[in-house]
C-alpha cells in the first residue's frame, strides 16, 4: 500500500467500470441504448420574417421584471411626496383626514 490514504488502486475511472449481464459486458456509464437522431426541418411560409437575433430578456420571476419594478417605485415616490404635500397644506395627517382619531393610544381598559 502507498502512504496516501486514498490509493489509486481503490478507485477506478468511470470509463473502466463495467458489469457482466447475461454474458454481455455493459458499461455502467452508458447503460442505455443510443437512439438514432432524426432531424425534421420545415420551410417557413412565404412572407415570414425571421428575427436576426433572439431577445436577451430573462424570464420574469413571479412577475417581477425590471420595467415593472421601475414603474412601481416611481408610483410609490409620487404617492409618498403627494401625501407629504397634502399633510403640509392641510396641517393634518392622512389618518385625521379620513376620520381616525390618533394620539389617544389604544384606549384599552386594564
Swiss-Prot record:
Tissue specificity field: Mostly expressed in cotyledons and shoot apices.
Source organism (scientific name): Arabidopsis thaliana
Quaternary structure, from the entry: May bind chlorophyll and form dimers in the thylakoid membrane. Component of a high molecular weight complex containing OHP1, OHP2 and HCF244, and PSII core proteins D1/D2, HCF136 and HCF173. Interacts with HCF244. Forms a trimeric complex with OHP2 and HCF244 that mutually stabilizes each subunit.
GO cellular component: chloroplast; chloroplast thylakoid membrane; photosystem II; plasma membrane
Stromal topological intervals: 42-74
Gene: OHP1
The protein's name in its UniProt record: Light-harvesting complex-like protein OHP1, chloroplastic
Observed phenotype of the null mutant: High light sensitivity leading to stunted growth with pale-green leaves on agar plates, but unable to grow on soil. Impaired photosystem II (PSII) core protein function and reduced levels of photosystem I core proteins.
GO biological process: circadian rhythm; photosystem II assembly; response to high light intensity
TM ranges: 75-95
MF (Gene Ontology): chlorophyll binding
Lumenal compartment spans: 96-110
Source organism phylogeny: Eukaryota, Viridiplantae, Streptophyta, Embryophyta, Tracheophyta
Protein location: Plastid, Chloroplast thylakoid membrane
Inducing factors: Induced by exposure to high light. Expression follows circadian diurnal fluctuations with highest levels before and shortly after the light phase.
Job description of the protein: May play a photoprotective role in the thylakoid membrane in response to light stress. Involved in photosystems I (PSI) and II (PSII) core proteins function. Forms a trimeric complex with OHP2 and HCF244 that is required to promote PSII core subunit assembly. The trimeric complex forms a transient PSII reaction center-like complex with PsbA, PsbD, PsbE, PsbF and PsbI subunits in thylakoids for early assembly of PSII as well as PSII repair. The trimeric complex is required for the recruitment of ribosomes to the psbA mRNA during PSII biogenesis and repair.
SUPFAM superfamilies cross-referenced by the UniProt entry: Chlorophyll a-b binding protein
Topology term for the membrane: Single-pass membrane protein
Result of altering residue 69 to A: Abolishes chlorophyll binding of OHP1 and OHP2 heterodimer
Transit peptide start and end: 1-41
Keyword annotations of the record: Chlorophyll, Chloroplast, Chromophore, Membrane, Photosynthesis, Photosystem II, Plastid, Thylakoid, Transit peptide, Transmembrane, Transmembrane helix
Family as reported in the entry's similarity comment: Belongs to the ELIP/psbS family.
Amino acid at each position: 500500500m502507498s502512504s496516501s490514504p486514498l490509493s489509486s488502486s481503490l478507485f477506478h475511472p468511470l470509463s473502466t467500470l463495467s458489469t457482466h449481464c447475461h454474458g454481455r459486458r455493459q458499461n455502467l456509464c452508458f447503460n442505455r441504448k443510443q437512439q438514432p437522431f432524426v432531424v425534421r426541418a420545415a420551410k417557413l411560409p412565404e412572407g415570414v420574417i425571421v428575427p436576426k437575433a433572439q431577445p436577451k430578456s430573462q424570464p420574469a420571476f413571479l412577475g417581477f421584471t425590471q420595467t415593472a419594478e421601475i414603474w412601481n417605485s416611481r408610483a410609490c415616490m409620487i404617492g409618498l411626496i403627494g401625501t407629504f404635500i397634502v399633510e403640509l397644506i392641510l396641517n393634518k395627517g392622512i389618518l385625521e383626514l379620513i376620520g381616525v382619531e390618533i394620539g389617544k393610544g389604544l384606549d384599552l381598559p386594564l
